Amino acid sequence: MLVAFMGVGLTIAAGLYATAMRRDKERELLFIGHEFRHALEGYNKANGAGQYPLTLEELLKDPRFPSAKRHLRRLYNDPITGKADWALVLQQGRIVGIRSTSAQRPIKQDNFDDDDAGLAKKPRYADWLFTYPHDLFTVPQNADVKR
């Protein structure tokens, strides 16, 4: 009987741990999404050009400047997939945002910051778009191009 109770307790603890880990990964995805959004904003506003990058690597070293101009320190892995397999959100062939490629259902469904209000009630992490500006209208079929 004691062994059965211990087994049930361990099962509950494992479930709670898995949920806590997913919540941590969601927070990390939000942080990384904001980093990319901020980098896209910096690239867009740099030198008054109003352009977006052609590649994510251009956020690491902006080719429009003779010396190193960095808008992003490094290319992050997607914390949900564990890989740098971001789907790019494109307009006119230029990167205006990123999104995860994960089809998993997010735990977080509401109570987002104002800049992330569009993430509410999305059925998949892949539906969480991190664009600059945050409320940029995008054409869905353009969001399927991968890096």
Identify the function of each model-found stretch:
Residues 38-147:
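Low-complexity, acidic interaction segments enriched in glycine
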Residues 16-24, 40, 44-47:
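Short amphipathic alpha-helical interaction patches enriched in hydrophobic/aromatic residues
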Residues 7-10, 33, 37:
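Hydrophobic faces of stable alpha-helices that mediate helix-helix packing
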Residues 22-33, 49:
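Membrane-proximal amphipathic alpha-helices
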Residues 3-22:
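C-terminal juxtamembrane segment of a hydrophobic transmembrane alpha-helix
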